[in-house]
Design a protein with these regions (language model features):
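Mobile "lid/hinge" segments at catalytic clefts and subdomain interfaces of large enzymes
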Residues: 61, 318, 326-336, 475-537, ...
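Conserved phosphate/anionic-ligand binding catalytic regions in large, soluble enzymes, centered on
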Residues: 45-52, 94-103, 240-253, 259-261, ...
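Glycine-rich phosphate/ribose-binding loops and adjacent secondary-structure elements
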Residues: 1-85, 90-99, 109, 114, ...
Length: 579
């Protein structure tokens, strides 16, 4: 009959706010009967929008269909328990311990919702790059039903590959095609015949392109590869999350080309420190300090060229970290000053940092221990990060790292992988613009990480304000990672994300795989610079006037009503980029 259902979040939020306006909200509960409320994220959204109770009829019917009557109540209890654990995890990210406090809190962000839709139905939830309106949602839902039912009324559902990659499903940033190309770069050093990335847009930067010049500059006029490589670094990947051997090879791979290696939050074996080891290539350039303070002592800090304070992780902000007990071997325990077999948890907050004054004190103390080391602070890309970054610069940080949601660990919960964090494009642009507006930009180096794997990513990040660039997942892929996403199980098929000595024997990666990958990216960056008509990365930092909408994506941007002004806002004249 041409009608369709109304999405439950839309209904709940509309009713919730209407009752508030009429001063009737406290007199009634809102109970949802929903067929598409399945994951913990779905429950969290409905509760945050005002739902008092949820009956996930679709989930219950599915459990009933696939489990015999004798197991139904056990399976139902397991499902409810997993949803409850997920909700507790989500609430804890905001420091909330009771469901009553989370109820109607509107503690959400939106990406891709139009301004009219947000103001009318989701007030107080910012939607930062524009997007679809009510009529677009209706059109999409009707089209889905038409495609699903077809002419034969078949209701069999296709797997859309939301979590596990499927060739005909949702596009993934690290699809098998992509990681095979990265590994090809790591083994051969030669660029594959086709691009590293999928043609389908996945990131905000895929909607943009940069202006090119005619004629293209000769490569001899472009800064050499070694200068570009000095701007590269490793993401913080801890010893414990990955094996000791792969951690060494990763550090060595970055050191071989003059790039920065990073310990991650798990400390480092003292035999790798440059003060006690002639082979300084395995001494991580950056020593990270996280909330758990694992492996942190004066010797560790003294061996650092840079000390990084990790406030949060872009892939799972507000979550902290956890190393399961079965991954805590005697070697890990010794390095982290712990006991074998005991789970190690980094809490979401630093319990000695509750203000800018606290972080200023920590920076002062770290510089007191190691005066020659620079101090960087890792912040998460999100709305408002620019103001926080300004305070951190005033507190004495030398480097600000903006971490995006698109990188991160294969051990992250599935809900965090899909529904937590912000693209680095937004946080980086806001931070650069805020620092510039407050006269602080010249006092700090801006760095970025989170899903960086191509030369084009480097160019876009530089245009949005970054001077340095960190590779995490892509560097591990060059080392041999096959994206099995079982890092937390200690059963890595290629012996990287494991502390089991038997499993570690599968590891075949070499430092040269990483160095070749980085060298290939740096050469590709030189090629891109020649197309733009600039001789160095320095010349394009903050030059958002070089951006324009990608012609291939013009229809998508128009149809989805996407507004990229927040990302590509230009406040600099061509001669004002001297950082």
């Amino acid at each position: 009959d041409g009608q369709t259902f109304i999405p439950m979040p839309l209904v709940v939020s509309a009713v919730h706010h209407h009752l508030i306006v009429k001063k009737l909200r406290s007199k009634a509960s809102i109970v949802c009967i929903s067929g598409n409320c399945i994951e913990d994220h779905h429950f969290a959204v409905l509760i945050a929008l005002g739902a008092s109770g949820i009956y996930p009829i679709g989930s219950y019917k599915t459990i009933q269909k696939y489990h015999p009557e004798s197991d139904f109540y056990i399976s139902l209890d397991n499902y409810r328990h997993s949803v409850e654990k997920g909700l507790l995890k989500i609430m804890s990210k905001m420091g909330i311990s009771t469901l009553t406090s989370y109820h109607g809190s509107m503690l959400l962000h939106a990406i891709g919702l139009g301004e009219r839709l947000s103001k009318e139905y989701f007030p107080s939830i910012p939607s930062l790059i524009g997007g679809i309106e009510l009529e677009d949602i209706e059109k999409t839902l009707k089209e889905r039903i038409r495609l699903q039912v077809g002419n034969n009324n078949s209701w069999s559902l296709k797997e859309n590959g939301l979590f596990r990659y499927r060739k005909s499903g949702e596009a993934h940033g690290y699809s098998p095609t992509v990681f095979k190309k990265i590994q090809y770069l790591g083994t051969s050093g030669k660029k594959p015949n086709n691009k590293v990335n999928d043609d389908r847009p996945i990131y905000i930067r895929d909607l943009l392109c940069y202006k090119t010049s005619r004629p293209i500059l000769n490569l001899e006029a472009i800064e050499d590869s070694s200068s570009i490589l000095k701007r590269f670094g490793s993401g913080g990947i801890s010893f414990g999350a990955i094996s000791e051997k792969s951690h060494r090879e990763l550090a060595k791979g970055f050191s071989l080309v003059g790039a920065r290696s990073n310990t991650g939050e798990g400390g480092e074996k003292s035999d790798r420190y440059s003060i006690s080891n002639d082979d300084i290539s395995v001494n991580s350039y950056v020593k990270q300090i996280a909330s758990g303070r694992f492996g942190v002592n004066s010797e560790y800090l003294a061996a650092a060229n840079e000390i990084q304070i990790k406030i949060a992780q872009g892939a799972k902000p507000g979550e902290g970290g956890q190393l399961p007990g079965f991954k805590v071997s005697s070697m890990i325990a010794a390095t982290r000053s712990s006991s074998p077999g005991i789970p190690l948890i980094s809490p979401p907050p630093h319990h000695d940092i509750y203000s800018i004054e606290d972080i200023k004190q920590l920076i002062y103390d770290l510089k007191d221990v190691n005066p020659r080391a620079k101090v960087s602070v890792k912040l998460v890309s999100q709305p408002g990060v620019g103001i926080v970054a300004s305070g951190v610069v005033k507190a004495g940080a030398n480097i600000i790292l903006i971490s995006g949601a698109d990188g991160g660990t294969g051990a992250s919960p599935l809900g965090s992988q899909k529904h937590t964090g912000f693209p680095w494009e937004y946080g980086l642009a806001e931070t650069h613009q805020t620092l510039y507006a407050n006269g602080l930009r010249e006092y700090v180096t801006l760095r970025v990480d989170g899903g960086i794997k191509r030369a084009e990513d480097i160019i876009f990040a530089a245009i949005l304000g970054a001077e340095e660039f960190d590779f995490g997942t892509s560097a591990l892929i060059a080392l041999g990672c096959v994206m099995a996403r079982q890092c937390h199980l200690n059963t890595c098929p290629v012996g990287i994300a494991t502390t089991d000595e038997k499993v570690e024997k599968r590891f075949k990666g070499k430092a040269e795989n990483v160095s070749r990958y980085l060298e290939s990216i740096s050469e590709s960056v030189r090629n891109e610079l020649s197309k733009i008509g600039k001789t160095s990365l320095h010349d394009i930092i903050g030059r958002t006037d070089l951006l324009k909408i990608n012609k291939k994506q013009e229809n998508l941007v128009k149809n989805k009503k996407i507004d990229l002004k927040a990302v590509s806002y230009t406040h600099l004249r061509a001669h004002e980029t001297d950082y």
